[in-house]
């Protein structure tokens, strides 16, 4: 049974709003307890992340990318199948250069429509192949994701 379209639409709106604000905690609050994040394409061999793993990595990412701006290009909501798709691009500043990433985010809602149960993200592989190792090194050099996130409590949308 699918959730009412209005419930899914409200969840989708909260998800996009948190993403636009670049607010990790608000974004995570839209995820179900059994949430899964899948990075696509599968050829990148990025393991599926659980909510607990995302709760560690996402705040560190948000703290690392400054002056974040998101541009939503398309949103498609398919309430009959409990799904939505968002095509977006974002820009920002990293400690080592620019952040320029395109996304196609495929969301699956919980049965009641109140949370996002699964997020499958098709990412710009050229950017990701460069970013991934540099982000890993940055986290390692700065005490890990929890330490990076803790140091990023200032206004994350402006230059620090």
From Swiss-Prot:
Family matches, as InterPro entries: Fungal_Meroterpenoid_Isomerase, NTF2-like_dom_sf, SnoaL-like
A Pfam family recorded for this sequence: SnoaL_2
Practical application: Secalonic acids show unprecedented anticancer activities against various human cancer cells and might be interesting for further derivatization, targeting diseases such as cancer.
Domain of life: Eukaryota
Keywords noted in UniProt: Monooxygenase, Oxidoreductase
An annotated Gene Ontology molecular function: monooxygenase activity
Described purpose of this protein according to its UniProt entry: Monooxygenase; part of the gene cluster that mediates the biosynthesis of the tetrahydroxanthone dimer secalonic acid D. The pathway begins with the synthesis of atrochrysone thioester by the polyketide synthase AacuL. The atrochrysone carboxyl ACP thioesterase AacuM then breaks the thioester bond and releases the atrochrysone carboxylic acid from AacuL. Atrochrysone carboxylic acid is decarboxylated by the decarboxylase AacuI, and oxidized by the anthrone oxygenase AacuG to yield emodin. Emodin is then reduced to emodin hydroquinone by a yet unidentified oxidoreductase.
Protein family according to the UniProt entry: Belongs to the avfA family.
Name listed for the protein in its UniProt record: Monooxygenase AacuO
